[in-house]
């Protein structure tokens, strides 16, 4: 009859009622259809019900057991009303107070056998695996037995399991659910990261070795070491450019200790700069040694003899230790071409501890022939060291013959390059060879 009237008592979006009330509604409709079949099609037994019965959800109360049903109040008029072709006026329908003088509709028990035989209760939910719909929800409620206009949105829940699933060892998303009781619904659960129970580390735990291990690892990186060395060199270059006197103090130190067999700054400074450039840090000091040959050596053999004799004299006198690394510089002149004389410096590095001995020579600086002849004429024929050289040096002759020329650094006036630079170039080369021959130091 409700389908024919086309009247819906509740909008589709009405919240669900208690299951007892849902079961009572179709039973009441069936009972009214059986007892009041003579009524007009325009009159429905549900018209006299107040709207709040279906539009307002009732508070959830414990369902009443069917074993003790309360008295049922008929919702249709007495069957003794005479049949009529006209519609029954609305006043004939019982008032809301009379129709619901008993318990509320949500408390009505399911229909009895007579009513249940006419209309059976709808299923609790669609038979879809993986979805669970609570028994408290009726899909036909509020739609007069028709299919709902709005599709249902059942909640998804994992299959019920007993207990808590064990957390996996690997970091995987897991669905953890508790045992589900009958008729209960579960919201969608999201995966959570599970930590390995075997790993028990605090938030402030440092890696193995602590901060010192980290610093050691970074310092041991070749690329980082190269960057630090370049930065250090740049800073040192800036300091030494602003104050050249700071160079010996900045680069002095380390395990390399060298003695130069001379107290002349032109030799000591050149050797110090070269070895500190190659080794980074080096202690270089000067100690005057005797060559025991002529002041102006002539020839390669004489120059090498003078450099070696300076080292030996310091060792014999005890000025330096027998195992001390020493560097000796000795300049000499040689006739490399007919009537062509050149000034050359000989460098000797001797390391008794490692058994290393190296020789190197500076670039050759041309010397005019007349100045060499003057030095030869000033040397007596019976000079006892004539076998090794001349009594008067070429520098002394040039200093007397030319203005603004120093006997110790006349090379600058003739070539534009100082003697210190020439010694530095040769000393840097011999320092590089010396470093290659040293055994590797343990890290």
UniProtKB/Swiss-Prot annotation:
GO molecular function: identical protein binding
Biased composition (Pro residues): 59-72
Pfam families: NTPase_I-T
Phosphoserine: residues bearing it: 406
Compositional bias of kind Polar residues: 29-45
GO cellular component: cytoplasm; Golgi apparatus
Binding partners and assembly: Interacts with PRKAR1A; resulting in PKA activation.
Name of the protein described by the UniProt record: Protein PRRC1
Naturally occurring in which organism (per UniProt): Mus musculus
Lineage: Eukaryota, Metazoa, Chordata, Craniata, Vertebrata
Gene that specifies this protein: Prrc1
């Amino acid at each position: 009859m409700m389908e024919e009237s086309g009247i819906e008592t509740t909008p589709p979006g009405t919240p669900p009622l208690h299951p007892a009330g849902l079961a009572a509604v179709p039973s009441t409709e069936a009972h009214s259809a059986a007892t009041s079949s003579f009524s007009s099609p325009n009159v429905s037994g549900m018209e006299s019900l107040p709207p709040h019965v279906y539009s307002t959800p009732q508070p959830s109360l414990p369902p009443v057991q069917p074993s003790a049903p309360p008295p049922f109040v008929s919702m249709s008029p007495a069957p003794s009303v005479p049949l009529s072709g006209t519609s029954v006026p609305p006043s004939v329908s019982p008032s809301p107070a009379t129709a619901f003088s008993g318990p509320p509709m949500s408390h009505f028990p399911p229909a009895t056998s007579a009513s249940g035989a006419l209309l059976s209760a709808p299923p609790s939910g669609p038979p879809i695996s993986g979805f669970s719909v609570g028994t408290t929800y009726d899909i036909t409620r509020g739609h007069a037995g028709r299919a709902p206009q709005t599709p249902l949105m059942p909640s998804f829940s994992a299959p019920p399991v007993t207990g808590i699933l064990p957390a996996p060892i690997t970091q995987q998303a897991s669905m953890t659910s508790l045992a589900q009781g009958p008729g209960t619904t579960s919201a969608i659960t999201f995966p959570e990261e599970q930590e390995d129970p075997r790993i028990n580390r605090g938030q402030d735990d440092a890696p193995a070795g602590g901060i010192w291990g980290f610093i050691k690892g970074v310092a041991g990186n070749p690329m980082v070491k190269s960057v630090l060395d370049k930065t250090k060199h740049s800073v040192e270059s800036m300091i030494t450019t602003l104050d050249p006197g700071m160079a010996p103090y900045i680069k002095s130190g380390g395990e390399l200790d060298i003695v130069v067999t001379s107290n002349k700054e032109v030799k000591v400074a050149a050797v110090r700069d070269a070895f500190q450039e190659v080794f980074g840090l080096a202690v270089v000091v000067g100690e005057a040694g005797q060559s025991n040959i002529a002041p102006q050596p002539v020839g390669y053999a004489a120059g090498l003899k003078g450099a070696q004799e300076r080292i030996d004299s310091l060792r014999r006198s005890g000025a330096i230790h027998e195992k001390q690394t020493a560097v000796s510089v000795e300049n000499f002149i040689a006739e490399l071409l007919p009537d062509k004389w050149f000034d050359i410096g000989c460098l000797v590095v001797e390391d008794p501890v490692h058994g290393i001995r190296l020789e190197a020579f500076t670039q050759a600086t041309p010397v005019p022939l007349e100045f060499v002849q003057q030095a030869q004429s000033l040397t007596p024929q019976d000079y006892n060291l004539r076998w090794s050289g001349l009594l008067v040096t070429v520098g002394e002759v040039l200093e007397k013959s030319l203005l603004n020329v120093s006997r110790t650094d006349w090379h600058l006036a003739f070539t534009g390059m100082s003697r210190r630079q020439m010694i530095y170039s040769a000393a840097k080369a011999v320092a590089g060879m010396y470093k290659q021959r040293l055994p590797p130091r343990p890290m």
